[in-house]
Structure formats: C-alpha cells, structure tokens
C-alpha cells in the first residue's frame, strides 16, 4: 500500500470512493516530483470527485496525474510546474472550471494557451516568473483564454471578485454545462417559461369554449 492509499484508507476508509467529492493533499510531498502509476490508480477510484487540491507537494510534471472526468476545481499552487505539459489537463479534466497554478515556475506565458480548449471560468496564476513585475499580465491572460471571468481574483473591469467557495460556485453553474449560466440566460429562460404558460392558458381557454 503506497502512502496515498494509506492516507485515503485512514481518512476515508468508512466511505466508498464514489461518495467522496473533495480531496486535499496539500503539503503531502510526492517522492519523485510526479505521481507514480500506483498513486494515479489509487486516486482514479474517486470517480465523482469535484475538488482536488495538490498544493505544495513537489510536483515538477503532470505525469501520471489521475484522470477524473467529473473534476470542477483543481489547485496546484506552490509546486515546480513549468507549464510545458499543461496540454494534458484538458484530457484529464474536461469539465474543469477553476484552476489555481500560482507560485509555480511558469516562465513562458504562452504555456497558458494550452489551457484554451478548457472552458475555464477562473484561474489563479500570480507569483510565477512571467507575472512578477508585469502589471499587464492579467489583461493578457484574459485575451489568451476568452472564457475566463476572473484572473487572480480580478474581473475584466479590474474589480476584485467576491470570495465564494467552490460548492456555491458549482450550484451557481448548474444551469449551464459550460459553467457560464449568467443573468441574461436566466432572463431568457424565464421568458420562455412565461410564453409556455401563456400558450398553455390559451389552449385551456380554447378547450373550454369548444366544450360549451
């Protein structure tokens, strides 16, 4: 039994893996700067996971990172990731909505382009070499990844976002599989509902008149 399996057994042994939605392994250092096959398999049992936090565990690559299709939130802060293999994230986590990669060693801002196939809504990239001393990086990240609404707790207007947890964010986004169910879409849905109700009432009225 590897240390990940031991940790999971000690903390979640009473639960089936499919019942767990959140796992936090912050400061839980990997032995070889990436996951092993055994560790990957251990975590892939958690098929309904929504939130995975792997902050400060010594990762230098995404090799053998577990593939969890349900994942909504991934935090990889304070590791040693360069971003050269960020193209793997789309395949591993196709539903990913929020990504934290601050405090890594990303020098090439272009590596963020590898995240474009994702429909990310929020990203945290501060404290990387490309962002230090660069007061225009937030705008550039918005330009590179057009689905984003928040970069480093800042929206496109330069306003600071209100703090929410990932549970609330997921509920807010239940109406849209892309995680972008906004007020305009909600208004459109309400209009459709009203139209359907009016049509239903008209049909009932016609039926009543015909029966008379």
Residue ranges of model-derived segments:
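Ankyrin-repeat and related helical/solenoid repeat scaffolds used for protein-protein interactions
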Residues: 89-129
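Residues that line or immediately flank small-molecule/substrate-binding pockets and catalytic motifs
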Residues: 27, 56, 66, 78, ...
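Leucine-rich repeat
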Residues: 17-19, 45-48, 65-71, 91-95, ...
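Canonical position 11/12 of the leucine-rich repeat
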Residues: 28-37, 58-60, 78-86, 96, ...
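Conserved hydrophobic beta-strand positions in leucine-rich repeat
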Residues: 21-26, 47-54, 71-76, 97-101, ...
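A conditional alpha-helix N-cap/helix-loop micro-motif detector
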Residues: 1-5, 55, 82, 102-105
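Recurring C-terminal helix/loop segment of individual leucine-rich repeat
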Residues: 12-15, 38-44, 60-67, 81-91, ...
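The feature captures the LRR N-terminal capping module
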Residues: 1-53, 130-212
């Amino acid at each position: 039994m590897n240390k990940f399996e031991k940790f999971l057994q000690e903390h979640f042994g009473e639960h089936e893996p499919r019942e767990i939605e959140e796992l936090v392994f912050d400061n839980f250092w990997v032995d070889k700067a990436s996951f092993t096959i055994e560790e990957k398999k251990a975590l892939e049992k958690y098929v309904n996971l929504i939130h995975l936090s792997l902050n400060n565990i010594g990762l230098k690559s995404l090799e053998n990172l577990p593939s969890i299709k349900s994942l909504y939130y991934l935090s990889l802060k304070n590791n040693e990731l360069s971003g050269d293999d960020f193209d793997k994230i789309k395949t591993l986590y196709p539903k990913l909505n929020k990504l934290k990669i601050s405090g890594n060693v990303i020098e090439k801002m272009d590596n963020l382009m590898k995240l474009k196939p994702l429909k990310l809504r929020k990203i945290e990239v501060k404290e990387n070499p490309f962002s230090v001393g660069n007061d225009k990086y937030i705008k550039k990240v918005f330009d590179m990844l057009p689905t984003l609404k928040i970069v480093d707790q800042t929206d496109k207007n330069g306003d600071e976002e209100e703090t929410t947890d990932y549970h609330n964010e997921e509920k807010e986004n239940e109406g849209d599989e892309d995680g972008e169910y906004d007020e305009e879409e909600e208004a459109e849905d309400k209009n459709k509902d009203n139209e359907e109700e009016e049509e239903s009432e008209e049909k009932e009225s016609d039926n009543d008149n015909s029966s008379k």
